Amino acid sequence: SDVYKREDEHSSVSANEQVTTANSVRPVVSVTTNFTKPTADTPALLTLGEVETFLHEFGHALHGIFAMTHYATLSGTSVYWDFVELPSQFMENYAVEPEFLNTFALHYQTDEPLPSSYIERIRKSRNFQAAYACMRQVSFGLLDMAYYTKPEAFTADVREFESQAWQRVKLLPELAESCMTVQFGHIMSGGYAAGYYSYKWAEVLDADAFAYFKENGIFNQYIAEKFRQALLSQGGTEHPMKLYVNFRGKEPGIQALLERDGISESVQTSKA
């Protein structure tokens, strides 16, 4: 194994396919990690961020491991761009669930579990300025779509075009010298052209899917088997929405995401 950070190693975690060609093979997937090394005094104690990152990449790995497709090119993460992050972001939800944390997040000397008050503080901290962060991501998606839905070559003033694209989501006064477009590499050279919305859409999907588990128990074997059979094993053999409905029984809604991010609760409180 090679799970710890090395000086000459790229600083990221990833899931990778190892076998892609054969008549009939079991999927072989690796999760390449970059965890903090142990020291002379302590073992390798993972940060919450490292746990979340591992769960994220493990979700991608499960997508490949459970593949049951006829063609390798349609297996695992070979799906629509706005669907590929569902399994990975779904798994991240477990990182702040007490029932999950109590299975391994124990003090390395005393075996004491994380106090419930700590877990609650972690959950609340994740929702700090969640509504603002949501609007920020939505604004980036709107700008992306504004550029890539133009039927003709772009010849307009960049700052003015950007300002108009953001009319519906402006929260703060604009700075005259600011221009997001010139540093928005994701949609110019990063592979997210006309697809930046997929970040927020993936959150809608993973929150809705995890809510299904929360309603029935986060380790519910029946729901987990549905997730594996109806969604993970199918790869890109069907349209993503059809796969999701086969698993969930309905199309996703935004309510689960709003509740997870504390936005729905805040709105209700402000109305009271």
Where are the language model's segments positioned?
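Cation-handling catalytic/transport regions enriched in His/Asp/Glu
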Residues: 1, 5-272
